[in-house]
């Protein structure tokens, strides 16, 4: 990248070299981590703009610093665009991350010790949905729901039983490793019956929701949180959507509650990404993500891998690698050695520890951003199968050649030199 050579290399060759190496990794490896994606040049440019210099504590029109007239425009653009994208009454675009967004909702609506119902991390939930090592699990009394052992899908009758038994102040839906559609309408019915607030963390599926490929939680949830990267293909950051009646409480929870100054350069990048997501081609992109995931999942199943829940409805799949005599940790390492990046992942009712696991998580947003199609997915599945079925140098060489050919055929940022 020219900016590395021109601006960073003369000033800091060590950082420049690390960035250059990461660029090479992204270009010449196949990125299958479900939570990662490749942003547009426009998003990158906005994030690297002069807005990084501006402090802007507060909200548009109500800042604690002068000179905010132009960053106010940017933040208002981001808020209005994302409200239009999801049909929301209120949006806060200041959270630095999805974790910050979730924490802000808890901070706004709960008191320490309040009971919350959230999805078990080992069944596909998220760290911030009550894990005992996270602030959510330390400060609040989380009760976990999971998936049925036979179907590996959420059993809404069990969720209802738990909700009526524990009467939580808040029910949290959403996941980091759940390959099926979530019925937000049903969960809102359960929340109403139990007298609970309802929050949806749609971080992984926000792009699919924006494109109309997954039920939109906004009409059903009191609060919707998300990251702005992943399927939404924006910068790394967070977002909260809510009904107008909760707007003041949410805004106060973010600032001055848990954050100081917003990252205005990131908010600018969010605004650009939301603008991109409002275009018709974004819908087609999301359709390709889902189609690619379906074909990749089916092809891996044909090659003898067990796919958790039998398939996928969204952008990701969980692959049980025990049929290859491997752990998730081993599979992650073997695939990385041939240029395929995945992450080890616990599968429901996993007998292995979270640091070892029996599965890997695979997602298609990043490869779809490179332009890869269903034929490419079949080639990726073949490369994965060869690498994991033939864990020797001969198998690795075959898989590496397949990866190199795909990366050459579908270049990343081809004009960014």
From Swiss-Prot:
Instruction: Report the gene name.
Output: glyA
Q: Where does (6S)-5,6,7,8-tetrahydrofolate bind?
A: 121, 125-127, 245
Claim: Amino-acid biosynthesis is one of the keywords in the record = yes
**InterPro entries for the chain:** PyrdxlP-dep_Trfase (IPR015424), PyrdxlP-dep_Trfase_major (IPR015421), PyrdxlP-dep_Trfase_small (IPR015422), Ser_HO-MeTrfase (IPR001085), Ser_HO-MeTrfase-like (IPR049943), Ser_HO-MeTrfase_PLP_BS (IPR019798), SHMT-like_dom (IPR039429)
Q: Which residues are annotated as modified residue N6-(pyridoxal phosphate)lysine in the UniProt record?
A: 230
Quaternary organization: Homodimer.
Protein species of origin: Desulfitobacterium hafniense (strain Y51)
The lineage's top-level taxon is Bacteria
What UniProt keywords apply to this chain's record, in alphabetical order? Answer: Amino-acid biosynthesis, Cytoplasm, One-carbon metabolism, Pyridoxal phosphate, Transferase
Cofactors that this protein relies on: pyridoxal 5'-phosphate
Record's protein name: Serine hydroxymethyltransferase
- Could you tell me the EC number(s) of this protein? 2.1.2.1
Its annotated compartments are: Cytoplasm
Tell me, what does this protein do in biology? Catalyzes the reversible interconversion of serine and glycine with tetrahydrofolate (THF) serving as the one-carbon carrier. This reaction serves as the major source of one-carbon groups required for the biosynthesis of purines, thymidylate, methionine, and other important biomolecules. Also exhibits THF-independent aldolase activity toward beta-hydroxyamino acids, producing glycine and aldehydes, via a retro-aldol mechanism.
Q: From the UniProt record, list the reaction(s) this protein catalyses.
A: (6R)-5,10-methylene-5,6,7,8-tetrahydrofolate + glycine + H2O = (6S)-5,6,7,8-tetrahydrofolate + L-serine
Q: Where is this site: Plays an important role in substrate specificity?
A: 229
GO MF entries: glycine hydroxymethyltransferase activity; pyridoxal phosphate binding
SUPFAM superfamilies linked to this entry: PLP-dependent transferases
Asked whether the keyword Transmembrane helix is assigned, the reply is no
